[in-house]
Amino acid sequence: MDDRAYDVLAMGRCGIDLYSNDVGVPFEQIRSFAAYVGGCPTNVSVGTRRLGLRSALLTGVGDDPVGDFVLHFLRQEGVETSFVPRKPGRRTGAVALGIEPPDRFPLVFYRENAADLALDLDDVLRAPVERSRVLFLTGTGLCADPSRTATLFAAERAAAAGT
C-alpha cells in the first residue's frame, strides 16, 4: 500500500477562463461571457479530485479578486490549496474564448505578469513532491523563469523520489 499524502500533485497554469455565451458569433460581437476556473493542471487537479483521488495543486495566484475566485472554487471542489501561494505584485491569469463551431475557437490570453509564472524553488521545496504518487507537469511553466527552473527542479525531485 502506498502511504503518500496525495495521489496527484499538478503544477502550472491557473486562472479564469471567460467563455462566450454567444455561440457562433464573431468574437467582436460577443455580448457576454461565463467565468470558469481554468488552466490544464488546475483542471487536472479538479478532475482527479472529482474521481475521488487525493489531489493538490502547485500554482501561484495574484493578490487580486481573480485569485480569490480561483481559490474559492478549488476549495469547494476539495483540491488541496496549501501549495498555492499569493504572489504580490503579480496577477492571476485570464483567457477569453469565442465559440464559432465547427472549428473556430478564437482566444485571447492575458498572461502579462502572471502569478503562476512566479513559482520559484522555495515554492517547490514547500510542496509535497515526494509525498505524491504522480507529479503532473505542463509546458507553460517552462516558458520563463523563475517557473522554468522551479518546474525542472520539481521534475528532478519527483524522479529521485520515484514519483
Residue locations for each model-derived region?
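Glycine-rich phosphate/adenosyl-contacting loop at the front of the ribokinase-like
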Residues: 1-80, 103, 119-121
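A short, structured active-site edge motif that brings together acidic residues
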Residues: 83-92
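Short beta-strand scaffold segments in enzyme catalytic cores
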Residues: 46, 94-98
